[in-house]
From Swiss-Prot:
The keyword Transport applies. Belongs to the ATPase alpha/beta chains family. This is V-type proton ATPase subunit B. V-ATPase is a heteromultimeric enzyme made up of two complexes: the ATP-hydrolytic V1 complex and the proton translocation V0 complex. The V1 complex consists of three catalytic AB heterodimers that form a heterohexamer, three peripheral stalks each consisting of EG heterodimers, one central rotor including subunits D and F, and the regulatory subunits C and H. The proton translocation complex V0 consists of the proton transport subunit a, a ring of proteolipid subunits c9c'', rotary subunit d, subunits e and f, and two accessory subunits. The keyword Nucleotide-binding applies. It holds the Pfam family ATP-synt_VA_C. PROSITE patterns: ATPASE_ALPHA_BETA. GO terms for molecular function: ATP binding; proton-transporting ATPase activity, rotational mechanism. The gene is ATP6V1B.
Length: 453
């Protein structure tokens, strides 16, 4: 946490040409000689050359306002869209306010993303924190953009979606991304008409490293203001958390701290928790913060410290798979390592449909067996497989082609997703569907997929 604490100690400096600079404390050494080492957060990487220094006597606060929606800021919170400065309604500490755990509300409203692999088998609740585990070259940005386009609340009546925009906002924070990624999200928000409800914070790859530590906290402070003061439902997209963790390692090394696993600081778990835990719902407030951090796993390694520690803190993960991507399946979401820990409370009768949990469990079981059969087929050949094995193979192919695969602008309701699931399960005789109760089978198994709800 030392690197983050350092980033909160600010000074205002004047450069040799009289230019004003803002800097954050990097190291403190009063034993050999009384000195503070600072690093600029508003200029290029490297030491800050200043001729005068003014201590602010305060921690780093950010101006917040509802007018920040529709605006683009740099990683330090300065407008970069040629618009006026923000007329602040308040100045808030970027580390946020501690929330009494007793005042947190358990997330129970499902967010419909329109993506079957998520809605059907890894449902997201409003107020949840669930990361996208991806890797270099995979379409994680496209998936996140599709979720932003299509996300809405499932109403308790049939086939009704809540797309109301007056109380919905998106806060997008980019850390260490290239210009192409920043342009992709900005143009996508503009094209689907949601830019007025989006606040962007962009720290590009050529921006200062220490700014990368501040950017997600600026975004989350803004999100907390919009959620708890303006009572909006806020979706926070953070990309790329791997760049953030590497910035943390760089600042930690500059401070000569004792390194931990793979050179990352020992407090990285605690530091990531200070970001991820700023999601959820609070008693007495109508707003919510749903977090979808995106991280790229180095060398596709899920045991790397960044995805490993993230998985401990967050409530599940959405796993983007390279093998599915290589087979031209979009979105390439592998449902087996994916998980949503809050799914059980967001689905079922009165929220989605009473068969939702049973269909999800049976699809998981059949897909897992299908994967085993596929591996066995590679060893013994198709001729050695039983008739049941061939059914699982057929299910495997149709599941990936019809259930997981869909278009980037295809928005399926949760009811359409469940109907596709039943179509696939009808490949098997009723006796083989052992994870679905007989009463549910009697009601849904014989039904024609075109039947009305």
């Amino acid at each position: 946490m030392a690197a983050v604490a350092a980033a909160r100690r600010m000074v205002n400096g004047a450069g040799p040409g009289g230019a004003r600079e803002q800097a954050a404390a990097l190291t403190r050494d009063f034993l050999s000689q009384p000195r503070l080492t600072y690093k600029t957060v508003s200029g290029v990487n490297g030491p800050l050359v200043i001729t005068s220094c003014e201590f602010t006597g305060d921690i780093l606060r950010t101006p917040v306002s509802e007018d920040m929606l529709g605006r683009v800021f740099n990683g330090s919170g300065k407008p970069i869209d040629r618009g006026p400065a923000v007329l602040a309604e308040d100045f808030l500490d970027i580390m946020g306010q501690p929330i009494n755990p007793q005042c947190r509300i358990y997330p129970e409203e499902m967010i419909q993303t329109g993506i079957s692999a998520i809605d059907g088998m890894n449902s997201i609740a409003r107020g949840q924190k669930i990361p996208i585990f991806s890797a270099a070259g995979l379409p994680h940005n496209e998936i996140a953009a599709q979720i932003c386009r299509q996300a809405g609340l499932v109403k308790k009546s049939k086939d009704v979606m809540d797309y109301s925009e007056e109380n919905f906002a998106i806060v997008f924070a980019a850390m260490g991304v290239n210009m192409e990624t920043a342009r992709f999200f900005k143009s996508d928000f503009e094209e689907n008409g949601s830019m007025d409800n989006v606040c962007l914070f962009l720290n590009l790859a050529n921006d200062p490293t220490i700014e990368r530590i501040i950017t997600p906290r600026l975004a989350l402070t803004t999100a907390e203001f919009l959620a708890y003061q303006c009572e909006k439902h806020v979706l926070v997209i953070l990309t790329d958390m791997s760049s953030y963790a590497e910035a943390l390692r760089e600042v930690s090394a500059a401070r000569e701290e004792v390194p931990g696993r793979r050179g990352f600081p020992g407090y990285m778990y605690t530091d990531l928790a200070t970001i991820y835990e700023r999601a959820g719902r609070v008693e007495g407030r109508n707003g919510s913060i749903t977090q979808i951090p995106i991280l790229t796993m180095p060398n596709d390694d899920i045991t790397h410290p960044i995805p490993d520690l993230t998985g401990y803190i967050t409530e599940g993960q959405i796993y983007v798979d390279r093998q599915l991507h290589n087979r031209q399946i979009y979105p390439p979401i592998n449902v087996l390592p994916s998980l949503s820990r809050l799914m059980k409370s967001a689905i079922g009768e009165g929220m989605t449909r009473k068969d939702h949990a049973d269909v999800s469990n049976q699809l998981y079981a059949c897909y897992a067996i299908g994967k085993d059969v596929q591996a066995m087929k590679a060893v013994v050949g198709e001729e050695a497989l039983t008739s049941d094995d061939l059914l699982y193979l057929e299910f495997l192919q149709k599941f990936e082609k019809n259930f997981i695969a869909q278009g980037p602008y295809e928005n399926r309701t949760v009811y359409e997703t469940l109907d596709i699931g039943w179509q696939l399960l009808r490949i098997f005789p009723k006796e083989m569907l052992k994870r679905i109760p007989q009463t549910t089978l009697a009601e849904f198994y014989p039904r024609d997929s075109t039947a009305k709800h």
